[in-house]
């Protein structure tokens, strides 16, 4: 280790300490820490590679999925040999069989004993004089078939877990593949290629080289000539199952691995660049350089995270949950803010707070007053036939046995009072709708106090209870308004038509229908949802005018599809299909004739119920009224009554009809005007005044204000989590600041390139050996240091040399020469 730059070697422990800073504080790392993730299929040899690094058997083994949680393995060079788990900090494991047992127990504690998996990692630190500083993440092996209680999508779950690690640009990928399988079908390389298509972050590891079929070898792969990776491949030979069962010593296995490569004719020329020891050195160097490159970005990310949290942390820094003064101040602030939020919701928001997605608060109440309430009133009107029949009965019953010569005004009063009484139901329904909407506003504004759930619940209870009291008062007052209209029939009203004008209209047969002119009432998107009309629901642009309904392909209104005259058209609600989110209504002719081609009704709908109500209110303005539910009567009796009316009675019926229509317009106009005013004054405004003047007093009357200001467990956890994250970031920045920044300023060694270039000018450039003869086999490498010896690690090999042809020896970390000049076996400085 004397040839290594100690400042650079400190980088791996720095990242380990940063990782621990987050883990110890119970905070997940939301930053992309530099690391190496070990990826491979089941039985690819991942565990054996890691055990060879440590020199001990310490990982669980068995059939199926053995690694069921990510294992963050931190190898730390130390004179003593022991292991330590982060979840058992301070407890040293010197028996590595106990380490294996602890991994199994900790895995089962989270995932259960039936092969379940979890993304929550286990942190294990191994101290040993036989390891280089290195951090790896052992991930579950890729599998195809679920076992035990594993879900059917276990393959996708493992794949997603692996991708969460290797998707990060700061993560190097150690792709472990058995050499006795087809590399083209390697799960590890395939997954690595998805996230690293250029092979810049992937290091290939070939295992089971000793198990390849006779006459085959992996020379071209190890020389990076097939499936090239910028960081190349390293071959290793692990213990077989027989060796593991026989408890073969790992040191003996490493010696056997070395002998295998030296003696094998296909690998002996590159034996110095194969094996577990070389792989460990390579990973140490590449991870060190990788950390060096990413550390400034990590520092910036930590600083940004801290700056984003500073405002909230400053609020929490001196936080005392049981301080009475703080509780009183918080209570006053919460109530004041609640009142302001209610007022803003009802009266309207500022430009900064206005919602652009949907109507809310006061806007919804406004729509109830001016769209929904008029629609409910019109729904209560009876149709012409029903009204004329009632007028006829009233006139006959008033005349009795006598033959009436004049139109009786008592018939007008009886019919008008019946119609006025019917206005009470929609008026009270308007109150219910507004109260429900106001309750929603109160609930939404109270949700801002979720930090104090008892205060929120108590405040909401007090305000809603008061609002319900005001609701009853409002309903009584609205009932009185209707009673006022019933108490006195003001036939001298300036807008009332009078008997003389009514009789004139009756004699002329004029229609009482108001002429709106050919004006546009509403435009918007609706779906034509007749199943047989179009295939599925299709949105069209509809334009409603006072006498017709047209629809177009789009809102440019260039391509008109159809225009439907509204004369005689009725409207009815229809239910949507099963699991349908569409609200629908239909247009039809009461006499049953087709409304469009062969279809007797036109079904229109959209997903928003409020939009449907607005459309139905617009149709009312155009004179399209809802379908009435009539009692079934005997047709013969109805025909007899219809044919028995004489011309004089018919004129009297028409006169009363015109009088009732004129008077009801006056009353309806009054009701439409007074009911919203009564609701606003008696409910909305009075509730607002109550909250400003009396709400705080009612809260103090509840008794224990300390209990009201008890913080929710969720909020406490949120605060603690933020403080943990803040302190973890602060600690991580402190750790990073200890790194010698001049070391970080050095130029890192170059990545492997696809061609060979001699070193730049220097005191002693490295000579380029002659390329191997085409198709021939290179002679065995001479001893290290002799003529023709391979360049030391960190120097580029010739194209024909092992690891050449697009590869390179793994780069060394930069060094500073000591007083005596460059260390041995190192290239002179550039």
From Swiss-Prot:
Its EC number is 3.6.5.5. Changing residue 70 to S: In dy51; temperature sensitive mutant which at the restrictive temperature of 25 degrees Celsius displays uncoordinated movements, reduced pharyngeal pumping rate, prolonged defecation cycle, an egg-laying defect and embryonic lethality of the progeny. Expressed in motor neurons in the head and in ventral nerve cord and, to a lesser extent, in sensory neurons in the nerve ring and the tail and interneurons. Expressed in pharyngeal-intestinal valve, intestinal-rectal valve and in intestinal cells. GO terms for molecular function: GTP binding; GTPase activity; microtubule binding. Residues 207-210 are annotated as: G4 motif. Residues 66-68 are annotated as: G2 motif. GO terms for biological process: embryo development ending in birth or egg hatching; endocytosis; locomotion; necroptotic process; phagosome maturation involved in apoptotic cell clearance; receptor internalization; receptor-mediated endocytosis; synaptic vesicle budding from presynaptic endocytic zone membrane. Residues 653-744 form the GED domain. It is found in: Cytoplasm; Cytoplasm, Cytoskeleton; Cytoplasmic vesicle, Phagosome membrane. May be a component of a complex composed of rab-5 (in GDP-bound form), dyn-1 and vps-34. Interacts with tax-6. This is Dynamin. It comes from Caenorhabditis elegans.
């Amino acid at each position: 280790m004397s040839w290594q730059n100690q400042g650079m070697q400190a980088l791996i422990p720095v990242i380990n300490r940063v990782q621990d800073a987050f883990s110890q504080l119970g905070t997940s790392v939301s930053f992309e820490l530099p690391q190496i993730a070990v990826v491979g299929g089941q039985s690819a040899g991942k565990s054996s590679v890691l055990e060879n690094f440590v020199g001990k058997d310490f990982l669980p083994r068995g059939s199926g999925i053995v690694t069921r949680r990510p294992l963050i393995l931190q190898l730390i060079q130390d004179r003593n040999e022991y292991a330590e788990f982060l979840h058992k900090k301070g407890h040293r494991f010197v028996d590595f069989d106990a380490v294996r047992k602890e991994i199994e127990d900790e895995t089962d504690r989270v995932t259960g004993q039936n092969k379940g998996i979890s993304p929550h990692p286990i942190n294990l630190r191994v101290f040993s004089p036989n390891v280089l500083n290195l951090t790896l993440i052992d991930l579950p092996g890729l599998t195809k078939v679920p076992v035990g209680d594993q879900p059917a999508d276990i393959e996708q779950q493992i794949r997603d877990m692996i991708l969460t690690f290797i998707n990060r640009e700061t993560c190097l990928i150690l792709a472990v593949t058995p050499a006795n399988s087809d590399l083209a079908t390697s799960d590890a390389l395939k997954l690595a290629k998805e996230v690293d298509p250029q092979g810049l972050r992937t290091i290939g590891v070939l295992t089971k080289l000793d198990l390849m079929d006779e006459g085959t070898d992996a020379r071209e792969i190890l020389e990076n000539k097939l499936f090239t990776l910028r960081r190349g491949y390293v071959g290793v030979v692990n213990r077989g199952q027989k060796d593991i069962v026989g408890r073969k010593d790992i040191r003996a296995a490493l010696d056997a691995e070395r002998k295998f490569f030296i003696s094998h004719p296909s690998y002996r020329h590159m034996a110095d660049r194969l094996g577990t020891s070389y792989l460990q050195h390579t990973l140490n160097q590449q991870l060190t350089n990788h950390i060096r490159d990413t550390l400034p970005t990590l520092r910036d990310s930590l600083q940004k995270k801290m700056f984003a949290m500073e405002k909230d942390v400053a609020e929490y820094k001196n936080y005392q949950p049981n301080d009475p003064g703080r509780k009183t101040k918080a209570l006053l602030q919460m109530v004041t803010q609640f009142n302001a939020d209610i007022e803003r919701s009802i009266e309207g928001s500022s430009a900064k707070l206005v919602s652009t997605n949907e109507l809310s608060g006061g806007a919804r109440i406004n729509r109830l007053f001016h769209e929904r309430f008029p629609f409910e009133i019109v729904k209560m009107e009876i149709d012409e036939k029903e009204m004329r029949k009632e007028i006829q009965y009233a006139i006959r019953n008033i005349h009795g046995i006598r033959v009436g010569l004049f139109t009786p005004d008592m018939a007008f009063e009886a019919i008008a009072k019946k119609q006025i009484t019917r206005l009470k139901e929609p008026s009270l329904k308007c109150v219910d709708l507004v109260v429900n909407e106001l309750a929603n506003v109160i609930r939404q504004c109270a949700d801002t106090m979720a930090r104090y759930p008892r205060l929120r619940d108590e405040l909401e209870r007090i305000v809603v209870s008061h609002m319900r009291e005001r609701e009853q008062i409002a309903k009584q007052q609205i009932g009185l308004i209707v009673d006022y209209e019933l108490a006195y029939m003001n036939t001298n009203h300036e807008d009332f038509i009078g008997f003389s004008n009514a009789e004139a209209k009756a004699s002329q047969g004029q229609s009482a229908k108001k002429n709106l002119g050919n004006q546009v009432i509403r435009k918007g998107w609706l779906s034509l949802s007749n199943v047989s009309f179009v295939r599925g629901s299709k949105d069209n642009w509809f334009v409603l005018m006072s006498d017709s309904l047209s629809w177009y392909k789009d809102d440019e209104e260039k391509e008109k599809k159809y225009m439907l005259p509204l004369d005689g058209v009725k409207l009815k609600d229809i239910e949507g299909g099963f699991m349908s989110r569409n609200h629908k209504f239909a247009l039809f002719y009461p006499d049953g004739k087709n409304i469009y081609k062969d279809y007797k009704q036109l079904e229109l709908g959209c997903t928003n119920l409020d939009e449907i109500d607005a459309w139905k209110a617009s149709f009312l303005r155009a004179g399209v009224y809802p379908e009435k539910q009539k009692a079934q009567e005997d047709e013969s009796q109805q025909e007899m009554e219809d044919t028995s009316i004489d011309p004089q009675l018919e004129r009297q019926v028409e006169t009363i009809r015109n009088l009732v229509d004129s008077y009801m317009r006056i009353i309806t106009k009054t009701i439409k005007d007074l009911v919203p005013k009564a609701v606003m004054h008696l409910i909305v405004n009075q509730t607002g005044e109550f909250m400003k003047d009396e709400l705080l007093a009612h809260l103090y009357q509840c008794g224990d204000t300390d209990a009201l200001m008890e913080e929710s467990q969720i909020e406490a956890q949120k605060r603690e989590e933020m403080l943990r994250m803040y302190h973890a970031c602060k600690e991580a920045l402190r750790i990073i600041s200890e790194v010698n920044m001049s070391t970080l300023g050095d130029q890192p060694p170059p990545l492997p390139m696809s061609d060979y270039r001699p070193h730049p000018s220097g005191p002693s450039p490295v000579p380029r050996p002659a390329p191997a003869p085409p198709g021939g086999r290179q002679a065995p490498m001479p001893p290290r240091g002799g003529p023709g010896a391979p360049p030391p690690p960190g120097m580029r090999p010739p194209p024909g040399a092992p690891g050449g042809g697009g590869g390179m020896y793994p780069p060394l970390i930069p060094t500073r020469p000591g007083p005596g000049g460059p260390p041995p076996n190192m290239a002179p400085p550039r």
